[in-house]
């Protein structure tokens, strides 16, 4: 099977429900399974006599999640036609010219799609009366009114599509009285079509239940004499198809993917050691915070670098605010923190430009706070004799700006944390003291230079950018590595490295300080020997 070039990978056997006809159901299921959206393939794909014309590629995940071809958001949706010798009866949705309203959606489906849509109507909304879907008596009356004689096979097709026959064939094991409740008017109002009911079929006194407007289908059937018969059937199938589409696209639909991701996040939150006032995460936070506080009080470094001590204490204070708001369930305090200590497009739209800086002082999780403060503290100790308070503030502001812009360019999710500043300090250390040796805690016997750490960080962020694609998480929703990559702002980290690069370039080229070396020259000099 070919993989999709779009934002998801198609499933071989998507969930489409119980078929009305076994043979047609298999064909329809196979078509749904093999049809993938690719920008280069705009030709017909034949499988079991079914031709498929895929639409152009779109970057919208919601459109490409539906493999059925019933997307109401495109007028050029796929057309599925069943060809079986002389028995050619495609069901093409049309709206009469006298009742077409601006913006109405045109529908094109196949007989197999019709069976599937009848299955949806009968399974999801069994409480609707059969008159809504149109009976064969109404169709024959409409044909006689137009001076046409209904063909036998066409009448049989319409008669077989009535609700009673569908219930008997589609739900052989269902018990009486087990129908789900009928949805309210407000739940389907967003999917109503603006076209009026065909007056030739349904008179002015006929009205759709729940306030639903109706559209008309035009069915062409070739009889034995070769004449083409055309008749209209009032239906509300597109309205219910809009609501039932997610279940047709299997586990890659937006609805099921969102539910599964939400369930996974709830399970992870229940296992998080940070939850609860007396949890291990909270106790660990208090201990580490106390040690950090006493270190600030007795350290001579912070007496000369009070700005660094203020930075660490501000991060600890904001983190304490997040913890208190989560523990006490104070919605007002939580809203205040979300508005003023989180960087997102909504806050920028409300002219909260200062969130570029305040979000770099904010941490919600214990691990994120401890790791960032540990790295920043260690790197600043090494750079304490090279960077002044002015350099510290300038580099912090530049890292906050570049990291925030880098994240907003590729993601709409809110972001917070001082990781960009940590990466900017790491780049500064690599250009100032490239031969400084570091030992990583999990592997202490494998020392790395500061230059190697920057190279490893760049490779890791590139790997995170590759793994953070929605296609991988849709294919492997239970993977913890992919969920971790989704929660990491790799673009913000790269923005922090870019901030360090810009600041070192300014120091070297503008101020003429030759102690700031070029990263590219260092890589050419020590790249081969280090590895």
From Swiss-Prot:
EC id: 3.4.21.105
Membrane topology: Multi-pass membrane protein
Source domain of life: Eukaryota
Stored InterPro entries: Peptidase_S54_rhomboid_dom, Rhomboid-like_sf, Rhomboid_protease_S54
Keywords linked to the UniProt accession: Hydrolase, Membrane, Protease, Serine protease, Transmembrane, Transmembrane helix
GO biological process, one term: proteolysis
Record field: compositional bias (Basic and acidic residues): 153-173
Primary subcellular site in the record, as a coarse category: membrane
Keyword hit for Transmembrane: yes
Free-text function comment from the UniProt entry: Putative serine protease involved in intramembrane proteolysis and the subsequent release of polypeptides from their membrane anchors.
Name of protein: Rhomboid-like protease 6
């Amino acid at each position: 099977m070919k993989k999709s070039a779009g934002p998801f990978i198609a499933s071989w056997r998507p969930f489409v429900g119980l078929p009305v006809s076994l043979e047609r159901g298999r064909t329809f299921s196979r078509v749904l399974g093999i049809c993938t959206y690719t920008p280069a393939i705009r030709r017909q794909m034949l499988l079991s006599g079914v031709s498929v014309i895929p639409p152009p590629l779109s970057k919208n995940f919601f459109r490409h999640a539906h493999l059925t071809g019933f997307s109401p958001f495109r007028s050029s949706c796929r057309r599925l036609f069943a060809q079986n010798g002389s028995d050619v009866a495609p069901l093409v949705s049309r709206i009469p010219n006298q009742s077409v309203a601006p913006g109405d959606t045109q529908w094109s489906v196949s007989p197999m799609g019709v069976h599937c849509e009848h299955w949806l109507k009968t399974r999801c909304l069994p409480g609707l009366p059969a008159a809504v879907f149109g009976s064969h008596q109404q169709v024959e009356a409409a044909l006689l009114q137009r001076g046409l004689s209904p063909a036998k096979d066409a009448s049989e097709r319409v008669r077989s599509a009535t609700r009673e026959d569908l219930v008997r064939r589609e739900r052989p094991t269902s018990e009486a009285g087990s129908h789900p409740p009928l949805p309210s008017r407000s739940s389907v109002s967003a999917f109503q079509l603006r076209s009026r009911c065909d007056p030739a079929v349904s008179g002015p006194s006929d009205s759709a239940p729940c306030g639903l407007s109706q559209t008309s289908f035009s069915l062409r059937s070739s009889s034995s004499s070769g004449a083409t018969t055309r008749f209209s059937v009032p239906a509300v199938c597109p309205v219910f198809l809009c609501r039932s589409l997610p279940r047709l696209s299997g586990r890659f639909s937006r609805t099921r993917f969102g539910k599964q991701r939400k369930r996974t996040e709830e399970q992870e939150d229940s296992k998080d050691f940070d939850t609860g006032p007396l949890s291990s995460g909270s106790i660990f936070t208090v201990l580490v915070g106390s040690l950090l506080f006493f270190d600030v009080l007795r350290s001579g470094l912070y007496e000369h670098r009070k700005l660094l001590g203020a930075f660490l204490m501000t991060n600890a204070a904001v983190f304490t605010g997040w913890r208190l708001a989560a523990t006490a369930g104070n919605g007002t305090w939580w809203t205040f923190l979300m508005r003023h200590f989180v960087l997102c497009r909504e806050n920028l739209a409300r002219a909260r430009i200062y969130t570029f800086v305040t979000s770099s002082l904010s941490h919600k999780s214990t691990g994120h706070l401890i790791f960032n403060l540990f790295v920043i503290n260690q790197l600043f100790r090494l750079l304490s004799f090279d960077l002044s308070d002015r350099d510290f503030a300038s580099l912090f502001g530049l890292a906050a700006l570049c990291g925030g812009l880098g994240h907003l360019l590729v993601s709409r999710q809110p972001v917070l944390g001082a990781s960009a500043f940590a990466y900017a300090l790491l780049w500064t250390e690599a250009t100032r003291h490239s031969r400084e040796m570091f030992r990583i805690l999990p592997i202490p016997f494998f020392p790395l230079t500061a230059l190697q750490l920057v190279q490893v960080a760049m490779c890791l962020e590139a790997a995170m950018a590759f793994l953070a694609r929605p296609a991988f998480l849709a294919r492997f929703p239970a993977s913890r590595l992919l969920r971790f990559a989704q929660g990491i702002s790799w673009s913000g980290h790269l923005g922090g490295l870019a901030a360090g690069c810009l600041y070192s370039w300014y120091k070297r080229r503008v101020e003429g300080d030759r102690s700031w070396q070029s990263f590219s020259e260092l890589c050419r000099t020590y790249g081969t020997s280090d590895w």
